[in-house]
């Protein structure tokens, strides 16, 4: 059951990421994130309420929540913008290496480091460099700058790594469900509300399905991940960390993104690195 939940979480997250990227191509990253936050909040808040009252809430917890929310939003901006500049099958796997950034922060903070973690981090860097080389071809689509897209994917990995590490500092105090709901409520206040006041939330009707899948899918994916951790955190991390692989497969086989050989090698190395980081 744990393996099934992990695969489902990775699949839902991967689909949500692709949907968000496609929505950003239609309406722009900012509006895509605003809608994703609003739709995600509709799901996240009831789930948080169903989980019971939140844990300790004080100034320290509030500051951590602000940091986590800022990192979540910055990561989404990077990913959605990256998917406008370049291919989904390159940006998503690079962004999925955020576990390596969290590991680096933990090392700096004084946590012990394993040889597997160092090796996986090195592999992730090599894979990201290879994935960024060359141009991706897609029938009917033109990418303005694949290298910029790869850099934005790496930027998402950095800020999401900080988010992952920061979440570990207060998850037991606040509760994972409330952490997810709080981040989305802040996202609505910071991004969606200002856009609404300026009349900037209007989107094309054809973008709505993508926005719905992106917003709801992200929350549902995290919920599946929480259930999966009951069967083992390491197993859950390995399986759900492959959301980038799912997104890449969608990009290659459904969106018909054509990668060069070096990029494919890079993606394979990233997949191996993500597994190694989850096991380290």
Feature roles, as predicted:
Residues 249-271:
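Interfacial loop-to-transmembrane junctions
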Residues 11-39, 53-54, 159-186, 235-238:
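Juxtamembrane helix-loop-helix junctions in multi-pass membrane proteins
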Residues 44-54, 102-117, 158-174, 218-236, ...:
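Hydrophobic alpha-helical transmembrane segments in multi-pass integral membrane proteins
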Residues 9, 65-73, 80-128, 178-186, ...:
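Specific alpha-helical transmembrane segments that line the substrate/conduction pathway
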Residues 11-14, 18, 45, 69-77, ...:
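Hydrophobic/small/kink-forming positions within alpha-helical transmembrane segments
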Residues 1-10, 19-20, 25-30, 34-65, ...:
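Membrane-interface interhelical linkers
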Residues 101-106, 116-135, 263-279:
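Hydrophobic transmembrane alpha-helices of multi-pass small-molecule transport proteins
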């Amino acid at each position: 059951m744990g393996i099934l939940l992990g695969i489902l979480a990775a699949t839902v997250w991967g689909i949500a990421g692709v949907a968000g990227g496609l929505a950003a191509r239609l309406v722009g990253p900012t509006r895509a994130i605003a809608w994703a936050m609003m739709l995600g909040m509709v799901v996240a808040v009831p789930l948080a309420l169903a989980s019971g009252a939140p844990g300790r809430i004080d100034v320290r917890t509030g500051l951590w929540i602000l940091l986590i929310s800022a990192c979540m939003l910055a990561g989404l901006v990077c990913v959605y913008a990256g998917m406008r500049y370049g291919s989904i099958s390159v940006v998503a796997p690079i962004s999925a290496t955020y576990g390596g950034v969290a590991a680096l922060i933990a090392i700096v903070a004084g946590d012990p480091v394993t040889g597997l973690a160092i090796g996986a981090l090195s592999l992730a860097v090599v894979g990201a460099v290879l994935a960024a080389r060359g141009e991706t071809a897609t029938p009917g689509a033109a990418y303005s700058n694949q290298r910029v897209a790869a850099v934005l994917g790496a930027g998402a990995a950095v800020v999401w790594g900080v988010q992952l590490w920061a979440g570990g500092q207060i998850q037991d105090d606040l509760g994972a469900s409330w952490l997810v709901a709080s981040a989305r409520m802040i996202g609505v206040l910071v991004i969606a509300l200002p856009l609404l006041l300026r009349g900037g939330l209007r989107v094309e009707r054809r973008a709505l399905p993508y926005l719905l899948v992106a917003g709801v899918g992200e929350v549902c994916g995290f919920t599946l991940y929480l259930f999966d951790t009951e069967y083992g955190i390491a197993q859950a991390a390995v399986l759900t960390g492959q959301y980038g692989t799912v997104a890449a497969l969608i990009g290659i086989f459904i969106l018909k993104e054509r990668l060069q050989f070096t990029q494919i090698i890079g993606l394979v190395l990233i997949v191996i690195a993500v597994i190694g980081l989850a096991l380290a």
